[in-house]
Swiss-Prot record:
Its main location: secreted. The active site is at residues 166, 197, 349. It catalyses: Exhibits low specificity toward esters of amino acids with small hydrophobic or aromatic residues at the P1 position. InterPro entries: PCSK9_ProteinaseK-like, Peptidase_S8/S53_dom, Peptidase_S8/S53_dom_sf, Peptidase_S8_Asp-AS, Peptidase_S8_His-AS, Peptidase_S8_Ser-AS, Peptidase_S8_subtilisin-like, Peptidase_S8_subtilisin-rel. It comes from the Bacteria. One of its GO terms (molecular function) is serine-type endopeptidase activity. Belongs to the peptidase S8 family. It is found in: Secreted. This is Aqualysin-1. It is an enzyme of class 3 (hydrolase). Pfam families: Inhibitor_I9, Peptidase_S8.
Length: 513
């Protein structure tokens, strides 16, 4: 009886809660508490890449521990009587789990006061395409064309640990010289690469011939299968493992992505807050990167791809969520078919490991640098104004590898509105901008929140549906800084800033469509 009590209680909440919903026919928004969100939102149900019947359940901070104690085996035993099949359990980057469940169980979790949100599990793919030398390294160590036919470096990344969240790595390949090993396999295999994508990415990061940082330690975190595809829940499992098991200084490379996923975004944010630098691919759809995850995570370094003529590659995503560009067309590197095999590929997948490699170079010389400091150094050191056809909203920044040892800081955004406020302690909240909502056309909303050191302030975005507010986005990491990107339809929007712990003044930046 004990093992079924928790979910039975959820169903009781569902039955009783159905009698308490406020109703309002006036389409004009109100800030009255009766019309605030009452149930956990479910994201991604209409996504064409959604996997039917599979969901990711994320608990609120401080909740769900009793259910997660004992790991996936215990969790499965407790939820199996309700027809819930648990596939992943998360205790590092997120507090939650992934499972197959029927609509009745989904609705029960949605009504639980302990659940932050639920998300449809989705297909995730590697961001690369095959194509029939090595110019990428040559380009990043110089400011201008023409290429010098050489790669100059003052560091090798020795002592830095890079986690390749991908299809695995052929760890025996000669490019790696014994520095590659298996960390984790979310698919239950041995971490070896049966696709090639992960080995190619690892070669660009740390191969002796093709690598930016030629002495790094490489760890395979396999989340994609032999076809180069996987699920959001599996990718989160890889991020969760990195968060719990990384050794500093640490960098993670994610040359993969898919549609918008709040769960994946929050997992990456929390992993960065735990001290891991993340380089993520912008995507290969020639579209706005703000519509992809984890590309839209502001704390990560989101990378677009360029050609050898310093033009944005025709396939590369673009926009304000891109932080910088790096070589990503016709990039040769190691391949999985033998210990000496090579292959030439195109993609933002190929651009991203150049950035991960430069992060490793910087961390060798600055091993205690925070992810924010590493990102600032890379962005401040980038070559500017050289690229063509970068796409609307994109920064004209090209990766540069010969960084100075100092770090700097960058503003979170340009051409955005700035607000301040104060929270008195846990449970206090403010609405922004300036205590009210705003009407917006369709497009991307982006916001950044900075609270005092040692606090934990969280960020929520609500949208008015004509009768009540719905939560459409949230950023609830464990630190004083949050960021959120959401692409939505025209309508009324409202930002809620909430103090989970601590008090004091905060800064808030808002970029509207």
């Amino acid at each position: 009886m004990r093992k079924t009590y928790w979910l039975m209680a959820l169903f009781a909440v569902l039955v009783l809660g159905g009698c308490q919903m406020a109703s309002r026919s006036d389409p004009t928004p109100t800030l009255a508490e009766a019309f605030w969100p009452k149930e956990a939102p479910v994201y991604g149900l209409d996504d064409p890449e959604a996997i039917p019947g599979r969901y990711i359940v994320v608990f609120k901070k401080g909740k769900g521990q009793s259910l997660l104690q004992g790991g996936i085996t215990t969790l499965q035993a407790r939820l199996a009587p309700q027809g819930v099949v648990v596939t992943q359990a998360y205790t590092g980057a997120l507090q939650g789990f992934a499972a197959e469940m029927a609509p009745q169980a989904l609705e029960a979790f949605r009504q639980s006061p302990d659940v932050e949100f639920i998300e449809a599990d989705k297909v995730v793919r590697a961001w690369a395409t095959q194509s029939p030398a090595p110019w990428g390294l040559d380009r990043i160590d110089q400011r201008d064309l023409p290429l010098s036919n050489s790669y100059t470096y003052t560091a090798t990344g020795r002592g830095v640990n890079v986690y390749v969240i991908d299809t695995g790595i052929r760890t025996t390949h000669r490019e790696f010289g014994g520095r590659a090993r298996v960390g984790y396999d979310a698919l239950g295999g041995n971490g070896q690469d049966c696709n090639g994508h992960g080995t190619h990415v690892a070669g660009t990061i740390g191969g002796v011939t093709y690598g930016v940082a030629k002495a790094v330690n490489l760890y395979a975190v396999r989340v994609l299968d032999c076809n180069g595809s996987g699920s959001t829940s599996g990718v989160i499992a890889g991020v969760d493992w990195v968060t719990r098991n990384h050794r500093r200084p640490a960098v993670a490379n994610m040359s993969l992505g898919g549609g918008v996923s709040t769960a994946l975004d929050n997992a990456v944010k929390n992993s960065i807050a735990a001290g891991v630098v993340y380089a993520v691919a912008a995507g290969n759809d020639n579209a706005n990167a703000c519509n992809y995850s984890p590309a839209r995570v502001a704390e990560a370094l989101t990378v677009g791809a360029t050609t050898s003529s310093d033009a944005r590659a025709s396939f590369s995503n673009y926009g304000s969520c891109v932080d910088l560009f790096a070589p990503g067309a016709s990039i040769p590197s190691a391949w999985y078919t033998s210990d000496t095999a090579t292959q030439t590929l195109n993609g933002t997948s190929m651009a991203t490991p150049h950035v991960a490699g430069v992060a490793a170079l910087y961390l060798e010389q600055n091993p205690s640098a925070t992810p924010a400091s590493v990102a600032s150094a890379i962005l401040n050191g980038a070559t500017t104004g050289r690229l063509s056809g970068i796409g609307s909203g994109s920064p004209n920044r090209l990766l540069y590898s010969l960084l100075s040892s100092g770090s700097g800081s960058t503003a979170p955004c340009t051409s955005c509105s700035y607000y301040t406020g104060s929270l008195s302690g846990p449970g206090d909240y403010n609405f922004q901008p300036n205590g009210t909502y705003y009407y917006s056309p369709a497009g991307t909303h982006r916001a950044w929140l900075r609270g005092p050191a040692g606090t934990d302030f969280d960020l929520y975005l609500w949208r008015w549906d004509g009768s009540r507010w719905l939560t459409v986005g949230s950023s609830t990491g464990p630190t004083s800084e949050e960021s959120l990107s959401y692409s939505g339809t025209a309508g009324y929007y409202l930002w809620r800033i909430y103090a989970y712990s601590g008090s004091g003044m905060y800064e808030f930046w808002l970029q509207r469509p």
